[in-house]
Amino acid sequence: MSKQAAVIELGYMGISVKDPDAWKSFATDMLGLQVLDEGEKDRFYLRMDYWHHRIVVHHNGQDDLEYLGWRVAGKPEFEALGQKLIDAGYKIRICDKVEAQERMVLGLMKTEDPGGNPTEIFWGPRIDMSNPFHPGRPLHGKFVTGDQGLGHCIVRQTDVAEAHKFYSLLGFRGDVEYRIPLPNGMTAELSFMHCNARDHSIAFGAMPAAKRLNHLMLEYTHMEDLGYTHQQFVKNEIDIALQLGIHANDKALTFYGATPSGWLIEPGWRGATAIDEAEYYVGDIFGHGVEATGYGLDVKLS
């Protein structure tokens, strides 16, 4: 894949929510994100670093993923990737300056992945160097972002092969990394794909799902912040779907907790650097035992 036509990070995402106030409290008190409310009636923003925002919270009541925003390096890469998508038969829409400004980027195109997940490709995000990130609660460190983007997502797909083809076209590498034996004798396969040093930025499998978004992973630089987040979930009796554990692929210490929208957040620490060599696993290193059920991850991992 030419560098002239490749995504380099998950730059931003949009979510829709039914209870904006619950999300403001959750984002700050539970996770340590910064809320930025600029007086817009239909949205507010969540910050993790110097970017104007990393997450847009829309008040339209769907409680699901609205879009994922994938960054390319600049205008030449943007134009080349757009042409790649057209040549491969995908429908894209190049947005005007008004739409681009709404996302606070210099250039924007919109499409959908094969699972119907709204997908945006952009260049030139707004970076507010005069407005340092101010966490919603005290943090020992910060969030891992930079050239690794904001984190990773698992999204719903109905055709894994087509999803792999689409994300490969965007410049991602990766394939099946987990083959998990199920009680019914079948095997669940999960694919993980990366576009930078983060072990993966997107993942998917052939699993039924009520929502587009299964979970979002955010990574702390300090284990103390992960530990405090876990403590906050327990203290506030928020559902924990998977207990603390370490994944076999990204080596991150994480747990999975419920958000006010019913999908999962995966706070983590110490994720490994992505590798290009393919390999797969049949379980995790330890932990990630199922606790609260019904969140789409009722699978024994260790």
Swiss-Prot record:
Protein name: 1,2-dihydroxynaphthalene dioxygenase
Cofactor(s) named in the record: Fe(2+)
Residues given in the record as Fe cation binding sites: H152, H215, E266
Coiled-coil residue windows: none
SUPFAM superfamilies: Glyoxalase/Bleomycin resistance protein/Dihydroxybiphenyl dioxygenase
Top-level EC class as recorded in UniProt: oxidoreductase
Binding site for substrate: H152, D199, H200, H215, Y256
UniProt GO BP: naphthalene catabolic process
Signal sequence region: none
EC identifiers of the protein: 1.13.11.56
Domain VOC: start-end pairs: 9-124, 149-270
Function according to Swiss-Prot or TrEMBL: Involved in the naphthalene catabolic pathway. Catalyzes the meta-cleavage of 1,2-dihydroxynaphthalene (1,2-DHN) to yield 2-hydroxychromene-2-carboxylic acid.
Organism: Pseudomonas sp. (strain C18)
Miscellaneous notes: Encoded on an unnamed 75 kb plasmid.
InterPro entries xrefs: Glyas_Bleomycin-R_OHBP_Dase, Glyas_Fos-R_dOase_dom, VOC, Xdiol_ring_cleave_dOase_1/2
Catalyses which reaction(s): naphthalene-1,2-diol + O2 = 2-hydroxychromene-2-carboxylate + H(+)
Keywords: Aromatic hydrocarbons catabolism, Dioxygenase, Iron, Metal-binding, Oxidoreductase, Plasmid, Repeat
Family stated for the protein in its record: Belongs to the extradiol ring-cleavage dioxygenase family.
Pfam annotation, one family: Glyoxalase
Keyword Iron: yes
